[in-house]
């Protein structure tokens, strides 16, 4: 059975997976670090402004469902959290590095094209080309894998369909189709992969700067 998350729970899980891969020396995360990650302005859609209390409520719910664990030591005054969302010893959800990168990016940014996913997962996984991303997406969308992601109707003026995870409930394809039909058909076309690549470069720089500032502040 597929895990069903609230939007805040999805953000928490996405952040824990991201930091596990990109900053392993700072993982597991304290509540403060996790809240900062949830509210990060780069590589997040939508940008949130959550309080520590809201994040802690989500963490407590995830702990009760065994999707997050508190890894703080016996005498530690600060709780540290890590996800148990996938690839745990007794869990059902097993993801390859590429699948994990794609799911993480979707939890953090919602619907995206294969081109966008290829560039935005550059710190999470390696893909030779967009075709390889599409192959992994097809596997995740298969009934055999429980349809973890779904292909959305192509938007007017776009060349690629977007894909969305279904960990926050089954996606209403009719609603997306209706939204696409309401969009002006004269929307200019863009090279999705090139735009996504430029966005990813800017966001990676922003994220590295934010992490550097956080590290400097922790040393002061």
From Swiss-Prot:
Signal peptide: none annotated. Belongs to the UPF0502 family. This is UPF0502 protein VV2_0756.
């Amino acid at each position: 059975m597929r895990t069903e998350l609230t939007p805040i729970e999805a953000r928490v899980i996405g952040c824990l997976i991201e930091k596990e891969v990109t900053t392993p020396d700072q993982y597991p995360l304290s509540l403060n670090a996790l809240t900062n990650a949830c509210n990060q302005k780069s590589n997040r859609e939508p940008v949130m402004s959550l309080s520590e209390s809201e994040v802690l409520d989500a963490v407590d719910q995830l702990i009760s469902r065994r999707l997050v664990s508190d890894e703080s030591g016996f005498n530690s005054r600060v709780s540290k959290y890590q996800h148990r969302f996938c690839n745990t010893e007794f869990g059902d959800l097993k993801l390859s590095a590429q699948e994990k990168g794609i799911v993480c990016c979707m939890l953090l940014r919602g619907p995206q094209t294969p081109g966008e996913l290829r560039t935005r997962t550059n710190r999470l996984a390696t893909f030779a080309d967009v075709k390889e991303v599409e192959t992994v997406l097809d596997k995740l969308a298969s009934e055999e894998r429980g349809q973890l992601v779904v292909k959305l109707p192509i938007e007017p003026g776009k060349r690629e369909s977007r894909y969305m995870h279904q960990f926050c409930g089954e996606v209403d394809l009719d609603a997306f189709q209706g939204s696409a039909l309401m969009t002006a058909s004269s929307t200019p076309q863009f090279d999705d992969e090139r735009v996504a690549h430029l966005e990813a470069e800017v966001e990676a720089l922003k994220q590295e700067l934010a992490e550097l500032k956080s590290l400097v502040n922790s040393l002061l």
